[in-house]
Protein backbone atom coordinates (compact mmCIF):
# COMPACT_ATOMS: atom_id res chain seq x y z
CA UNK A 1 0.00 0.00 0.00
CA UNK A 2 2.91 2.38 0.82
CA UNK A 3 3.72 2.63 -2.88
CA UNK A 4 0.25 4.01 -3.67
CA UNK A 5 0.61 6.93 -1.30
CA UNK A 6 2.32 10.14 -2.41
CA UNK A 7 5.85 10.54 -1.02
CA UNK A 8 5.21 13.33 1.48
CA UNK A 9 2.23 11.53 2.99
CA UNK A 10 4.24 8.28 3.23
CA UNK A 11 7.11 10.08 4.96
CA UNK A 12 4.76 11.94 7.31
CA UNK A 13 3.18 8.62 8.30
CA UNK A 14 6.64 7.27 9.15
CA UNK A 15 6.81 4.79 6.26
CA UNK A 16 10.17 3.98 4.67
CA UNK A 17 10.92 6.33 1.76
CA UNK A 18 13.89 6.66 -0.61
CA UNK A 19 14.39 10.39 -0.11
CA UNK A 20 12.98 13.17 2.06
CA UNK A 21 9.99 14.93 0.47
CA UNK A 22 10.42 18.62 -0.35
CA UNK A 23 8.02 21.58 -0.42
CA UNK A 24 8.19 25.21 0.72
CA UNK A 25 6.05 27.34 2.97
CA UNK A 26 4.58 30.17 0.86
CA UNK A 27 5.69 28.34 -2.29
CA UNK A 28 2.80 30.03 -4.12
CA UNK A 29 3.39 33.74 -3.90
CA UNK A 30 5.14 36.98 -4.64
CA UNK A 31 8.54 35.62 -5.68
CA UNK A 32 6.88 34.03 -8.77
CA UNK A 33 6.33 36.30 -11.78
CA UNK A 34 3.23 34.35 -12.78
CA UNK A 35 1.72 35.18 -9.37
CA UNK A 36 2.65 38.86 -9.57
CA UNK A 37 1.02 39.06 -13.02
CA UNK A 38 -2.18 37.51 -11.66
CA UNK A 39 -2.08 39.87 -8.67
CA UNK A 40 -2.13 42.85 -11.04
CA UNK A 41 -5.38 41.57 -12.51
CA UNK A 42 -6.85 40.70 -9.10
CA UNK A 43 -5.39 43.17 -6.57
CA UNK A 44 -7.55 42.07 -3.62
CA UNK A 45 -5.84 39.37 -1.54
CA UNK A 46 -9.17 38.22 -0.19
CA UNK A 47 -10.48 37.72 -3.71
CA UNK A 48 -7.37 35.78 -4.71
CA UNK A 49 -7.69 33.52 -1.67
CA UNK A 50 -11.50 33.21 -1.52
CA UNK A 51 -12.41 32.87 -5.19
CA UNK A 52 -12.05 29.09 -5.69
CA UNK A 53 -10.86 29.35 -9.31
CA UNK A 54 -8.13 31.84 -8.38
CA UNK A 55 -7.08 30.03 -5.20
CA UNK A 56 -6.85 26.77 -7.17
CA UNK A 57 -4.82 28.38 -9.96
CA UNK A 58 -2.38 29.98 -7.51
CA UNK A 59 -2.05 26.74 -5.47
CA UNK A 60 -1.06 24.94 -8.68
CA UNK A 61 1.47 27.54 -9.95
CA UNK A 62 4.47 26.13 -8.03
CA UNK A 63 3.36 22.57 -8.81
CA UNK A 64 3.49 23.30 -12.54
CA UNK A 65 6.81 25.14 -12.17
CA UNK A 66 8.76 22.95 -9.73
CA UNK A 67 6.82 19.75 -9.01
CA UNK A 68 7.21 19.93 -5.20
CA UNK A 69 6.11 16.89 -3.19
CA UNK A 70 3.43 18.95 -1.46
CA UNK A 71 0.76 21.24 -2.90
CA UNK A 72 -0.55 23.58 -0.22
CA UNK A 73 -3.88 25.36 -0.38
CA UNK A 74 -3.46 29.05 -1.25
CA UNK A 75 -5.30 30.78 1.56
CA UNK A 76 -4.60 32.73 4.75
CA UNK A 77 -4.68 31.90 8.44
CA UNK A 78 -7.30 34.66 8.88
CA UNK A 79 -9.65 33.25 6.21
CA UNK A 80 -11.98 31.56 8.77
CA UNK A 81 -12.51 34.76 10.81
CA UNK A 82 -15.51 36.21 8.89
CA UNK A 83 -17.33 32.89 9.48
CA UNK A 84 -17.07 33.68 13.20
CA UNK A 85 -18.24 37.27 12.73
CA UNK A 86 -14.82 38.96 12.59
CA UNK A 87 -14.20 40.90 9.40
CA UNK A 88 -10.73 41.72 8.09
CA UNK A 89 -8.93 43.13 5.09
CA UNK A 90 -5.40 42.49 3.91
CA UNK A 91 -3.66 45.63 2.74
CA UNK A 92 -0.69 45.07 0.42
CA UNK A 93 2.54 45.93 2.28
CA UNK A 94 0.67 46.60 5.55
CA UNK A 95 -0.75 43.16 6.20
CA UNK A 96 -4.04 42.27 7.86
CA UNK A 97 -6.33 44.85 9.44
CA UNK A 98 -9.16 43.67 11.73
CA UNK A 99 -12.13 45.99 11.32
CA UNK A 100 -13.40 45.70 14.89
CA UNK A 101 -10.73 44.32 17.27
CA UNK A 102 -12.03 41.90 19.93
CA UNK A 103 -11.34 43.30 23.39
CA UNK A 104 -14.48 42.79 25.53
CA UNK A 105 -16.40 39.88 27.02
CA UNK A 106 -19.49 40.93 25.11
CA UNK A 107 -17.61 40.69 21.80
CA UNK A 108 -16.22 37.24 22.64
CA UNK A 109 -19.65 35.96 23.70
CA UNK A 110 -21.15 37.21 20.43
CA UNK A 111 -18.68 35.31 18.23
CA UNK A 112 -20.33 32.68 16.06
CA UNK A 113 -19.39 29.02 16.09
CA UNK A 114 -17.58 28.33 12.83
CA UNK A 115 -19.51 26.22 10.33
CA UNK A 116 -16.84 25.59 7.67
CA UNK A 117 -19.10 23.91 5.10
CA UNK A 118 -21.24 27.05 5.15
CA UNK A 119 -18.76 29.94 5.44
CA UNK A 120 -15.70 28.28 3.88
CA UNK A 121 -17.19 26.13 1.12
CA UNK A 122 -14.72 27.70 -1.36
CA UNK A 123 -11.86 26.09 0.62
CA UNK A 124 -13.54 22.70 0.34
CA UNK A 125 -13.97 23.24 -3.38
CA UNK A 126 -10.29 24.11 -3.91
CA UNK A 127 -9.02 21.18 -1.85
CA UNK A 128 -11.21 18.64 -3.61
CA UNK A 129 -10.13 19.99 -7.03
CA UNK A 130 -6.47 19.85 -6.01
CA UNK A 131 -6.83 16.29 -4.70
CA UNK A 132 -8.50 15.16 -7.92
CA UNK A 133 -6.16 16.92 -10.35
CA UNK A 134 -2.84 16.35 -8.58
CA UNK A 135 -3.91 12.71 -8.41
CA UNK A 136 -1.37 11.63 -5.77
CA UNK A 137 1.60 12.97 -7.76
CA UNK A 138 2.03 15.18 -4.68
CA UNK A 139 0.46 15.38 -1.23
CA UNK A 140 -2.32 17.93 -0.68
CA UNK A 141 -1.66 20.12 2.35
CA UNK A 142 -4.18 22.13 4.33
CA UNK A 143 -3.39 24.60 7.08
CA UNK A 144 -4.78 26.82 9.82
CA UNK A 145 -3.60 29.46 12.26
CA UNK A 146 -3.44 28.36 15.89
CA UNK A 147 -5.66 29.96 18.56
CA UNK A 148 -2.94 32.15 20.14
CA UNK A 149 -1.88 33.62 16.79
CA UNK A 150 -5.48 34.26 15.69
CA UNK A 151 -6.17 35.87 19.06
CA UNK A 152 -3.06 38.05 18.70
CA UNK A 153 -4.37 39.38 15.38
CA UNK A 154 -7.95 39.97 16.50
CA UNK A 155 -7.04 41.62 19.81
CA UNK A 156 -4.23 43.80 18.42
CA UNK A 157 -6.25 44.57 15.28
CA UNK A 158 -3.18 44.20 13.07
CA UNK A 159 0.36 42.83 13.05
CA UNK A 160 2.28 43.96 16.09
CA UNK A 161 5.90 44.40 17.12
CA UNK A 162 5.46 43.82 20.84
CA UNK A 163 1.95 42.35 21.32
CA UNK A 164 1.24 44.72 24.21
CA UNK A 165 -2.56 44.59 23.83
CA UNK A 166 -2.94 40.81 23.92
CA UNK A 167 -0.31 40.51 26.65
CA UNK A 168 -2.18 43.13 28.64
CA UNK A 169 -5.31 40.98 28.25
CA UNK A 170 -3.33 37.84 29.20
CA UNK A 171 -2.08 39.35 32.44
CA UNK A 172 -5.07 41.55 33.39
CA UNK A 173 -8.04 39.56 32.08
CA UNK A 174 -6.80 35.99 31.61
CA UNK A 175 -10.33 34.53 31.83
CA UNK A 176 -11.44 36.67 28.89
CA UNK A 177 -8.45 35.58 26.80
CA UNK A 178 -8.99 31.91 27.69
CA UNK A 179 -12.61 32.21 26.56
CA UNK A 180 -11.46 33.62 23.21
CA UNK A 181 -8.73 30.98 22.80
CA UNK A 182 -11.18 28.19 23.62
CA UNK A 183 -13.63 29.49 21.01
CA UNK A 184 -10.87 29.56 18.41
CA UNK A 185 -9.61 26.07 19.34
CA UNK A 186 -13.05 24.50 18.77
CA UNK A 187 -13.62 26.41 15.53
CA UNK A 188 -10.15 25.73 14.14
CA UNK A 189 -10.45 22.03 15.02
CA UNK A 190 -13.69 21.90 13.02
CA UNK A 191 -12.09 23.81 10.15
CA UNK A 192 -9.17 21.38 9.96
CA UNK A 193 -11.57 18.42 9.91
CA UNK A 194 -13.42 20.10 7.04
CA UNK A 195 -10.15 20.53 5.14
CA UNK A 196 -9.26 16.87 5.63
CA UNK A 197 -12.75 15.75 4.59
CA UNK A 198 -12.41 17.93 1.46
CA UNK A 199 -9.06 16.46 0.37
CA UNK A 200 -6.16 17.62 2.58
CA UNK A 201 -3.88 14.63 3.28
CA UNK A 202 -1.50 16.38 5.71
CA UNK A 203 -2.26 19.56 7.67
CA UNK A 204 -0.08 22.23 9.25
CA UNK A 205 -0.88 24.45 12.22
CA UNK A 206 0.88 27.82 12.15
CA UNK A 207 1.31 29.40 15.57
CA UNK A 208 3.38 32.17 14.07
CA UNK A 209 3.35 34.43 17.13
CA UNK A 210 3.70 31.83 19.90
CA UNK A 211 7.46 32.40 19.74
CA UNK A 212 6.72 35.78 21.37
CA UNK A 213 5.71 34.01 24.59
CA UNK A 214 7.91 33.03 27.51
CA UNK A 215 7.90 29.25 28.07
CA UNK A 216 5.61 29.61 31.11
CA UNK A 217 3.15 31.74 29.13
CA UNK A 218 3.34 29.29 26.22
CA UNK A 219 2.21 26.63 28.70
CA UNK A 220 -0.72 28.81 29.67
CA UNK A 221 -1.92 30.44 26.44
CA UNK A 222 -0.55 28.53 23.42
CA UNK A 223 0.32 24.89 24.12
CA UNK A 224 -3.02 23.81 25.66
CA UNK A 225 -4.99 25.25 22.74
CA UNK A 226 -2.70 23.72 20.10
CA UNK A 227 -3.29 20.43 21.93
CA UNK A 228 -7.05 20.96 21.94
CA UNK A 229 -7.08 21.53 18.16
CA UNK A 230 -5.01 18.36 17.66
CA UNK A 231 -7.34 16.32 19.90
CA UNK A 232 -10.44 17.51 18.01
CA UNK A 233 -8.88 16.50 14.68
CA UNK A 234 -7.39 13.19 15.87
CA UNK A 235 -10.73 12.11 17.37
CA UNK A 236 -12.09 11.91 13.83
CA UNK A 237 -8.95 11.57 11.70
CA UNK A 238 -6.37 9.76 13.84
CA UNK A 239 -4.22 8.85 10.82
CA UNK A 240 -3.89 12.33 9.30
CA UNK A 241 -0.42 13.72 10.04
CA UNK A 242 -0.35 17.14 11.73
CA UNK A 243 2.64 19.51 11.49
CA UNK A 244 3.17 22.38 13.96
CA UNK A 245 5.19 25.46 13.01
CA UNK A 246 6.18 28.28 15.34
CA UNK A 247 8.53 31.08 14.34
CA UNK A 248 11.12 31.55 17.09
CA UNK A 249 10.45 28.15 18.66
CA UNK A 250 13.94 27.28 19.97
CA UNK A 251 12.84 27.89 23.57
CA UNK A 252 9.75 25.67 23.41
CA UNK A 253 10.66 22.63 21.27
CA UNK A 254 10.07 20.13 24.08
CA UNK A 255 6.73 21.76 24.81
CA UNK A 256 5.68 21.58 21.15
CA UNK A 257 6.37 17.85 21.26
CA UNK A 258 3.75 17.44 24.01
CA UNK A 259 0.86 18.78 21.92
CA UNK A 260 0.18 15.50 20.11
CA UNK A 261 1.44 16.66 16.69
CA UNK A 262 3.26 14.24 14.40
CA UNK A 263 5.87 16.63 12.98
CA UNK A 264 7.56 19.79 14.26
CA UNK A 265 8.55 22.36 11.67
CA UNK A 266 11.72 24.20 12.73
CA UNK A 267 12.73 27.75 11.95
CA UNK A 268 16.41 28.30 11.05
CA UNK A 269 17.59 29.73 14.38
CA UNK A 270 18.04 26.35 16.05
CA UNK A 271 20.80 23.83 15.28
CA UNK A 272 19.06 20.82 13.74
CA UNK A 273 21.32 18.35 15.57
CA UNK A 274 20.42 19.96 18.87
CA UNK A 275 16.72 19.92 17.90
CA UNK A 276 16.98 16.18 17.19
CA UNK A 277 18.21 15.60 20.74
CA UNK A 278 15.39 17.69 22.19
CA UNK A 279 12.49 16.30 20.13
CA UNK A 280 11.43 12.68 20.82
CA UNK A 281 12.33 10.23 18.06
CA UNK A 282 8.73 9.37 17.27
CA UNK A 283 8.09 12.93 16.11
CA UNK A 284 9.20 13.96 12.63
CA UNK A 285 11.05 17.16 11.77
CA UNK A 286 10.47 19.59 8.92
CA UNK A 287 12.31 22.65 7.65
CA UNK A 288 15.23 24.48 9.32
CA UNK A 289 16.79 25.85 6.11
CA UNK A 290 17.25 29.65 6.27
CA UNK A 291 15.08 31.17 3.49
CA UNK A 292 17.84 33.76 3.10
CA UNK A 293 20.12 31.08 1.60
CA UNK A 294 17.97 31.31 -1.54
CA UNK A 295 19.52 34.72 -2.18
CA UNK A 296 22.90 32.98 -2.40
CA UNK A 297 24.47 31.13 -5.31
CA UNK A 298 23.56 27.61 -6.40
CA UNK A 299 26.60 26.10 -4.69
CA UNK A 300 25.74 27.60 -1.30
CA UNK A 301 22.10 26.48 -1.63
CA UNK A 302 23.13 22.89 -2.40
CA UNK A 303 25.71 22.84 0.39
CA UNK A 304 23.19 24.08 2.96
CA UNK A 305 20.64 21.45 1.91
CA UNK A 306 23.30 18.71 2.12
CA UNK A 307 24.53 19.92 5.50
CA UNK A 308 20.99 19.99 6.92
CA UNK A 309 20.11 16.56 5.53
CA UNK A 310 23.35 14.93 6.69
CA UNK A 311 22.60 15.99 10.26
CA UNK A 312 19.12 14.47 10.23
CA UNK A 313 19.50 11.39 8.02
CA UNK A 314 18.31 8.98 10.68
CA UNK A 315 15.07 10.86 11.43
CA UNK A 316 11.71 11.26 9.73
CA UNK A 317 12.35 14.50 7.82
CA UNK A 318 10.61 16.81 5.33
CA UNK A 319 12.89 19.26 3.52
CA UNK A 320 11.50 22.79 3.78
CA UNK A 321 12.56 26.29 4.70
CA UNK A 322 12.54 27.59 8.27
CA UNK A 323 9.98 30.24 7.25
CA UNK A 324 8.00 31.13 4.13
CA UNK A 325 10.05 31.82 0.99
CA UNK A 326 10.85 35.53 0.87
CA UNK A 327 9.52 37.96 -1.73
CA UNK A 328 12.27 38.81 -4.20
CA UNK A 329 13.80 35.32 -4.07
CA UNK A 330 15.11 34.47 -7.58
CA UNK A 331 12.84 31.80 -9.08
CA UNK A 332 15.83 29.87 -10.42
CA UNK A 333 17.09 29.52 -6.83
CA UNK A 334 13.76 28.06 -5.76
CA UNK A 335 14.18 25.67 -8.71
CA UNK A 336 17.65 24.69 -7.41
CA UNK A 337 16.20 24.04 -3.94
CA UNK A 338 13.59 21.63 -5.33
CA UNK A 339 15.89 19.95 -7.86
CA UNK A 340 18.71 19.38 -5.39
CA UNK A 341 16.29 18.30 -2.68
CA UNK A 342 14.99 15.56 -4.95
CA UNK A 343 18.54 14.20 -5.46
CA UNK A 344 18.98 13.39 -1.76
CA UNK A 345 18.82 9.70 -0.88
CA UNK A 346 18.63 7.76 2.36
Swiss-Prot record:
UniProt subcellular location: Cytoplasm
Biological process, per Gene Ontology: protoporphyrinogen IX biosynthetic process
Any GO molecular function: uroporphyrinogen decarboxylase activity
Keyword Glycoprotein: no
Primary residence: cytoplasm
Keywords tagged on the record: Cytoplasm, Decarboxylase, Lyase, Porphyrin biosynthesis
InterPro entries membership: UROD/MetE-like_sf, Uroporphyrinogen_deCO2ase_HemE, Uroporphyrinogen_deCOase
One GO cellular component term: cytoplasm
Transmembrane feature ranges: none
Documented EC number(s): 4.1.1.37
Catalytic activity: uroporphyrinogen III + 4 H(+) = coproporphyrinogen III + 4 CO2
Protein function: Catalyzes the decarboxylation of four acetate groups of uroporphyrinogen-III to yield coproporphyrinogen-III.
Subunit structure: Homodimer.
Protein name: Uroporphyrinogen decarboxylase
Native organism: Prochlorococcus marinus (strain AS9601)
